[in-house]
Amino acid sequence: MTQFTHINASGEANMVDVSAKAETVREARAEAFVHMAPETLQLIVSGQHHKGDVFATARIAGIQAAKKTWDLIPLCHPLLLSKVEVQLEAIEAENKVRIESVCKLAGKTGVEMEALTAASVAALTIYDMCKAVQKDMVIGQVRLLEKTGGKSGHFKAES
């Protein structure tokens, strides 16, 4: 069984030492969904939401969150991200918004947590902006879709 990398021999949490690792190009994609009432989704899609452009705000929030992941998650390394992209798509037939994030860098540690944080915070921002009109929205299925680079190689989630 693979060992947890953030726990030392005494069972204490610690930050992994990556100083001896080689720099490689690393990329990760993650997704999240926000399920809502058709009326709420229509407010977003039509641009009629009283707080403004929900997707633009969520996109910027996701990008900012990726850059702050090291500050939010205690054992994450501060990273010099070379790319953060957050795409939002209204899926009207299913009354939900799909968020996909991509993070990339050339470095010694992966960007999975940054991609997951970007998608999660974008989803939270949608909730925050729309909670006045609907409080029972559901944020769900936050997951890593794919990652490349590094010692563990390529990972792709099953559809």
Curated annotation (Swiss-Prot):
Pathway it works in: Cofactor biosynthesis; molybdopterin biosynthesis
Question: Which Pfam families did the record assign?
Answer: MoaC
For whether the record's keyword set contains Lyase, the answer is yes
Catalytic activity reads: (8S)-3',8-cyclo-7,8-dihydroguanosine 5'-triphosphate = cyclic pyranopterin phosphate + diphosphate
Gene Ontology BP annotations: Mo-molybdopterin cofactor biosynthetic process
Listed SUPFAM superfamilies: Molybdenum cofactor biosynthesis protein C, MoaC
Q: Which GO terms describe its molecular function?
A: cyclic pyranopterin monophosphate synthase activity; GTP 3',8'-cyclase activity
Keywords assigned by UniProt, alphabetized: Lyase, Molybdenum cofactor biosynthesis
Which residues are involved in binding substrate? L75, C76, H77, M113, E114
Describe the function of this protein. Catalyzes the conversion of (8S)-3',8-cyclo-7,8-dihydroguanosine 5'-triphosphate to cyclic pyranopterin monophosphate (cPMP).
Q: How does it assemble?
A: Homohexamer; trimer of dimers.
- List the PANTHER family hit by this protein, alphabetically: MOLYBDENUM COFACTOR BIOSYNTHESIS PROTEIN 1, MOLYBDOPTERIN COFACTOR SYNTHESIS PROTEIN A
Could you tell me which HAMAP family the record lists for this protein? Answer: MoaC_B
List the protein's name.
Cyclic pyranopterin monophosphate synthase
